[in-house]
UniProtKB/Swiss-Prot annotation:
Transmembrane segments: none annotated. PROSITE patterns: RIBOSOMAL_L35. It comes from the Bacteria. Belongs to the bacterial ribosomal protein bL35 family. Keywords: Ribonucleoprotein, Ribosomal protein. InterPro entries: Ribosomal_bL35, Ribosomal_bL35-like, Ribosomal_bL35_CS, Ribosomal_bL35_sf. Residues 1-16 have a biased composition (Basic residues). The keyword Ribonucleoprotein applies. GO terms for biological process: translation. GO terms for molecular function: structural constituent of ribosome. GO terms for cellular component: cytosolic large ribosomal subunit. This is Large ribosomal subunit protein bL35. Residues 1-25 are annotated as: Disordered.
Length: 65
């Protein structure tokens, strides 16, 4: 049976925290920023955790993490 490989796109987008939760970057922060308010852009900084409903999919993409 072949090795289970991590999806390269998931490898670039997600990081697994020591507790087992997964963190991801915020969306909507790449372009068309002029019409977004300063408050909105500030709140999009940093990273957030992956929601529980998506955790199974993310875990399936990263079997070795």
């Amino acid at each position: 049976m072949p090795k289970m490989k991590t999806k390269s796109g998931a490898k670039k987008r997600f990081r697994v925290r020591p507790g087992g939760t997964v963190k991801r970057g915020q969306a909507f922060k790449r372009h068309i920023l002029t019409k977004k308010t300063t408050k909105n852009k500030r709140q999009l900084r940093g990273s957030v955790g992956v929601h529980d409903t998506n955790m199974v999919s993310v875990r399936a993409m990263m079997p070795n993490a």
